[in-house]
C-alpha cells in the first residue's frame, strides 16, 4: 500500500493544482487566443517539454509521457508513479504600432498518475488544461473630425482535459497505447462598438458557450536494439477527428454611456441554449530517436494538424494546417552512482512551429528553446524537475509575443507492491 505521507502529498498537490487551474482563468492577455479553441497548451510532461517537446519515442520507467500513450508500457512493474507540474510565465506583447504590454502569471500544467496492471499492460490517468482563452483588443476608428468610435474584442475561458490511457506490449520491443480524453470548459466571446458621443447608441454582442466532448489518441512505439551501443526508436501518434459539442447563448445589448455609467436600452436573445458541433482536426505525429536507457536520448519529432478543417456548424474559422518540428534529448551521467551529481538528468531541446493561425495573409509562427534539470532525492527515484523556456510567437507586422517560462514539477516513484521480507 502507499505510505500515508504520499497520500497526503498527492492530496495536497491535487488541491494546489486545482486552485491554480481556477486562477488560470485570469490568464495573460493573448490576442491570438481569440481564434479557434483558444491558445492550445503544450500538453507535454515536464520531462518531454524540457527536450523541446520531443517525446513520441521517449520511454521511462519513472516518468509519465502522455505525448504517446504507448510509452506507458515502460512503467516500473512494482511502482506507483505520480507527476505534477506548474509554470511561471512572463511575457511581453509588442504591436506593429510600437505599443507594448507586459505581464506574468502562474499556470497549472498537469497532474498525472501511472501504474502497472500486468507486465504487458500499464495504465495512466490525469488532468491538464487543453486550451486557454483570454484576450482584449481595442480598435479605434474615426469617421470625421469629431466623430470617433472604438471596436473592442474581449473574451475569456478555457477547456480542461481529463484523460485515461492504457498501453499494451503486443510483442517484444513493440507497444500500442490509447488515450481517451474528456474535454469540458467554457468560452465567453464579446464584441462592442462604442461611440465617443455620449448620446449615441452603443452595442455589445456576447456569446457564451459550454463545451463538452471527447478525443481519442492512439500511439505505437518500436525499438530496434543495436548490439550493446543503444537502440533506435520509432514512434507514431494519431488523434482522430471526433466532433465535440457546445451549448451556447448569445445576447445583443444596446446601451448609452460606457463602463459602470452605462444605461441599458434594450437586450435581445437571438440564440438560447443552441447546440453547436465543432469539427475537430486530424493530428498525426511521428518520431525517430537514438539512445540508451537511463543514459542518453536524442530524438526528433514532426507533428501535422489538419486545422484547416476546423469548423463550428460547418462555418470555418479561417484556420490553416499546423506543422511542428522538435528536436531534443537528455543525458544522465550515471543513474546508479552513489554520488549525487552523476544521478542528475540534463535536458536540452528546441522547436519551430507554423501554427494554425494565418492573419491578414501573415502566418503566425512560434519557436522556442528549452533547458531542463532533474534532481533525484537520495536513495530514491522520486525527485524534482526544473525546465526553462524562451520563445517567440507572432510577427512584428501584427503582434509579437516574447515569453519566458519556468516550469517546476514533482515526480513521485513509490514501490507499493513489494513485499517485506521476514527474518
Give a label for each model feature.
Residues 1-29, 423:
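Bacterial Sec-dependent N-terminal signal peptides
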Residues 25-423:
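Subset of outer-membrane beta-barrel
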Amino acid at each position: 500500500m502507499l505510505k500515508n505521507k504520499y497520500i497526503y502529498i498527492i492530496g495536497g498537490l491535487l488541491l494546489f493544482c486545482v486552485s491554480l487551474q481556477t486562477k488560470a482563468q485570469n490568464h495573460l492577455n493573448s490576442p491570438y487566443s481569440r481564434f479557434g479553441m483558444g491558445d492550445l497548451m503544450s500538453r507535454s510532461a515536464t520531462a518531454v517539454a524540457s527536450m523541446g517537446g520531443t517525446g513520441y519515442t521517449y520511454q521511462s520507467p519513472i516518468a509519465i509521457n502522455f505525448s504517446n500513450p504507448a510509452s506507458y508500457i515502460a512503467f516500473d512493474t512494482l511502482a506507483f508513479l505520480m507527476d505534477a507540474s506548474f509554470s511561471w510565465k512572463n511575457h511581453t506583447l509588442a504591436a506593429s504600432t510600437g505599443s507594448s504590454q507586459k505581464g506574468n502569471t502562474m499556470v497549472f500544467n498537469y497532474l498525472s498518475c501511472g501504474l502497472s496492471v500486468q507486465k504487458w499492460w500499464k495504465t495512466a490517468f490525469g488532468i491538464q488544461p487543453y486550451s486557454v482563452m483570454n484576450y482584449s483588443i481595442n480598435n479605434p476608428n474615426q469617421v470625421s473630425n469629431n466623430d470617433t468610435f472604438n471596436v473592442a474584442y474581449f473574451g475569456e475561458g478555457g477547456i480542461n482535459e481529463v484523460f485515461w490511457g492504457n498501453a499494451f506490449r503486443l510483442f517484444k520491443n513493440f507497444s500500442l497505447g490509447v488515450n481517451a480524453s474528456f474535454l469540458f470548459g467554457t468560452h465567453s466571446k464579446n464584441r462592442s462598438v462604442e461611440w465617443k458621443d455620449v448620446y449615441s447608441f452603443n452595442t455589445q454582442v456576447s456569446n457564451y458557450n459550454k463545451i463538452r466532448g471527447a478525443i481519442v489518441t492512439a500511439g505505437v512505439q518500436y525499438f530496434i536494439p543495436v548490439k550493446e551501443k543503444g537502440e533506435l526508436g520509432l514512434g507514431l501518434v494519431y488523434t482522430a477527428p471526433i466532433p465535440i459539442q457546445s451549448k451556447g447563448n448569445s445576447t445583443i445589448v444596446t446601451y448609452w454611456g460606457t463602463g459602470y455609467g452605462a444605461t441599458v436600452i434594450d437586450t435581445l436573445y437571438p440564440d438560447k441554449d443552441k447546440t453547436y458541433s465543432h469539427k475537430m482536426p486530424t493530428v498525426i505525429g511521428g518520431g525517430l530517436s537514438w539512445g540508451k536507457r537511463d543514459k542518453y536520448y536524442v530524438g526528433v519529432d514532426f507533428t501535422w494538424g489538419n486545422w484547416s478543417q476546423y469548423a463550428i456548424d460547418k462555418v470555418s474559422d479561417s484556420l490553416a494546417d499546423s506543422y511542428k518540428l522538435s528536436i531534443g534529448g537528455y543525458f544522465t551521467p550515471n543513474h546508479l552512482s552513489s554520488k549525487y551529481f552523476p544521478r542528475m538528468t540534463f535536458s536540452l531541446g528546441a522547436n519551430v512551429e507554423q501554427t494554425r493561425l494565418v492573419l491578414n495573409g501573415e502566418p503566425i509562427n512560434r519557436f522556442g528553446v528549452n533547458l531542463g534539470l532533474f534532481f533525484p532525492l537520495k536513495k530514491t527515484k522520486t525527485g524534482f524537475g526544473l525546465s526553462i523556456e524562451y520563445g517567440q510567437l507572432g510577427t512584428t507586422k501584427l503582434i509579437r509575443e516574447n515569453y519566458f517560462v519556468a516550469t517546476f514539477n514533482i515526480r513521485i516513484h513509490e514501490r507499493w507492491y513489494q513485499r517485506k521480507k521476514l527474518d
